Amino acid sequence: PLLAIETIEKLTKKIKSVLPLGCKYNADMVTNGYKLTRRVAEKLKDMDIHYIQVTLDGSKQAHDSRRILHNHQPTFEHILDNIRECADILNISIRINVDKTNINEATEIFDWLERYGLKGRVGYYLAPVDDINGVCNNHICMERPQYAKEEIAFIKEGIKRALCTKVLSRAIMVYVEQLA
C-alpha cells in the first residue's frame, strides 16, 4: 500500500470528512516495510494510522531468497532499518511467515531485533504459511500440531531472551511458564 501513499491520504481525508460528529477514525496497515521511511511513518501517524504489521519471510537468508527486488538485491536489512527508524512513531509488529523450510531459523529474528536496537520497541509473532488457494506447495506447509509445537518453542525462546512480544496474551505467558 505504501506505493500509493497519496491515494491513502486522499481516501483518509474523504472518510474523515463524512464521519458523523463525535466519531473518530483510525486504521491499521499491513506492509512489506520496504517503503516505510520515517517521513512516511509521520504521514501515516498524521492520518491516524498508528499500527503497522510488517511481514518478513523468516530468517534473513529465507527472506532474501524469496523477496528480492527486480535487480536481485536483498530486502531484509533494509526493512529492519526502516522499522528501526519508525518504531518511535508507530506501533509496529513483525509477522514472521514460516513453513517447513524456514521454521528452524525463525529464532534468528531475536538476534536481529537486538542488533537493530528493537528489543522492546516492536512486537513480533509467527504466522504459518497456509495453502488457502492452492498456491502453496503442500509439502512446505506445516500441519497445525507441528506449527503449534514450533510456535510454543519460539515463544519460550523469546521469553528466555527477555524479548517478550507486545502481543503475547497473559494466558499464553502462563501456559508457556508451565511448560518450562
Language-model regions, residue ranges each:
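Radical SAM enzyme [4Fe-4S]-AdoMet core and its adjacent flexible, acidic
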Residues: S65-R84, D88-L179
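Canonical radical SAM enzyme core domain
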Residues: L2-Y51, T55-A62, L69-H78, I96-E108
